[in-house]
């Protein structure tokens, strides 16, 4: 989703935002990166680079990783931990509209994928804590009071995670 501040963009409704697995915010490039971008466009080298691109993964490799991810184990106590975090978004005074059950499913899937990327076949509480802000930030609508106090969805998510007891 493009930033709302950009002319010609429209804010997506909550129901559509909820269908995105995660929100990852990209900042501006560094000075050096921006000069590299300019150089690519100045010399038309970007066209040459496009011709030399090779896929990182084949379709078969991607599907294989998906099957591996489905085999990553999530203990029932961690499923409850995920559900408790998401439930907190629905009762927090800082949140006007909390996350739906789809957010719980997304957090579980993202945690499994992250665990797999870390070389494990099981999810830990740390995996859940890591992915939670990315999974929840676009799903939460804060109250006007929370926004006036300088809270962001990421900050609220962090506070909610801190309130939920970590399974042992």
Where are these regions (language model features)?
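C-terminal engagement/docking regions of AAA+ P-loop ATPases
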Residues: 89-168
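Non-catalytic accessory segments flanking P-loop/AAA+ NTPase cores
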Residues: 28-39, 52, 70-74, 144-168
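Broad hydrophobic/π-residue packing in well-ordered secondary structure
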Residues: 10, 18-20, 28, 77, ...
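Canonical AAA+ ATPase core
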Residues: 1-72, 112-117
């Amino acid at each position: 989703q493009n930033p709302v501040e950009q002319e010609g963009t429209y804010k997506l409704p909550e129901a559509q935002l909820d269908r995105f697995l995660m929100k990852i915010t990209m900042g501006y490039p560094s000075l050096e990166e921006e000069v590299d971008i300019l150089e690519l466009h100045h010399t038309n080298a970007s066209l040459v680079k496009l011709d030399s691109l090779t896929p990182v993964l084949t379709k078969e490799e991607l599907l294989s990783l998906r099957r591996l991810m489905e085999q990553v184990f999530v203990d029932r106590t961690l499923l409850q931990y995920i559900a408790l975090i998401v439930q907190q978004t629905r009762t927090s005074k800082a949140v006007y509209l909390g996350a739906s059950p789809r957010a719980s499913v997304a957090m579980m899937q993202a945690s499994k994928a992250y665990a797999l990327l870390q070389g494990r076949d099981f999810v830990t509480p740390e995996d859940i804590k890591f992915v939670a802000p990315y999974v929840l930030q676009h799903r939460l609508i804060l109250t006007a009071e929370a926004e006036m106090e300088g809270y962001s969805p990421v900050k609220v998510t962090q506070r909610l995670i801190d309130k939920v007891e970590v399974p042992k």
